[in-house]
């Protein structure tokens, strides 16, 4: 597999069933996630940007193997994420190898949440990919809930509408955000995420930023974002 594939590709699958969706719904959503992490210049955690999540898998850092467990955000290791990944690997070409998977979780958004624009990998990490899987078995375009992808000026360049079993594979350095549903749909929008990069790179990022408190690169208020890199990515599409 080459990380030059799937810069921003959409695939429609027959993955979702009512039975699978019920398994997703019944997962314990005990933790919250935010796209706007605290920084030295803005140390306060923005509670209004948080939303519910279920962590399925987290990589184990060499420096502190119990790091995620001690923080209370360890993966549940529910077999569900591996079963779905096995299906995706048969349907979608050129996915990264499994041993590059470092995180998997289900995010829950609903009307009134306010997720932020973010990137999944810092601009200098070329070998990365994110997979999003839309899990709701029924979705009406009137309900909103799109994933928005932005260019180097943070102008919207592409919107991907939820659809049962729809999968998006993309370079995580592209700024993006999930939109909540409109007032027409006052229930949960479920999305499963898989995140990849080489194990060596993920370990180094952990050591630099979690253990040694190295400040992250930031531009336009987005951690890891670099306009020139994003401009180049869009030019390659």
Predicted features along the sequence, with ranges:
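Extended, compositionally biased low-complexity polar/Lys-Gly-rich tracts
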Residues: 18, 32, 62, 77-85, ...
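Double-stranded beta-helix
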Residues: 193-237
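Catalytic core of non-heme Fe(II) oxygenases with the double-stranded beta-helix
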Residues: 89-210
């Amino acid at each position: 597999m080459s990380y030059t594939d799937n810069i921003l590709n959409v695939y429609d699958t027959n993955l979702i069933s009512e039975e699978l969706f019920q398994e997703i719904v019944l997962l314990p959503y005990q933790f919250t996630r935010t796209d706007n992490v605290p920084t030295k210049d803005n140390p306060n955690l923005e509670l209004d940007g948080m939303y519910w999540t279920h962590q399925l898998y987290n990589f184990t850092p060499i420096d502190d193997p119990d790091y995620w467990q001690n923080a209370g955000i360890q993966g549940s290791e529910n077999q569900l994420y591996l079963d779905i990944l096995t299906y995706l690997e048969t349907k979608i070409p050129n996915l990264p190898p499994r041993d590059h998977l470092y995180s998997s979780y289900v995010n829950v958004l609903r009307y009134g949440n306010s997720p932020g624009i973010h990137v999944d990998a810092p601009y200098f990490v070329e070998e990365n990919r994110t997979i999003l899987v839309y899990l709701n078995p029924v979705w009406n375009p009137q309900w909103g809930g799109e994933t928005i992808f932005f260019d180097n000026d943070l102008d919207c360049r592409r919107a991907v509408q939820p659809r049962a079993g729809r999968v998006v594979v993309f370079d995580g350095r592209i700024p993006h955000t999930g939109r909540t549903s409109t007032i027409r749909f006052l229930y949960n929008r479920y999305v499963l995420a898989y995140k990849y990069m080489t194990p060596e790179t993920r370990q180094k990022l952990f050591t630099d930023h979690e253990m040694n408190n190295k400040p992250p690169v930031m531009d336009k208020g987005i951690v890891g974002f670099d306009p020139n890199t994003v401009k180049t990515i869009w030019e390659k599409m």
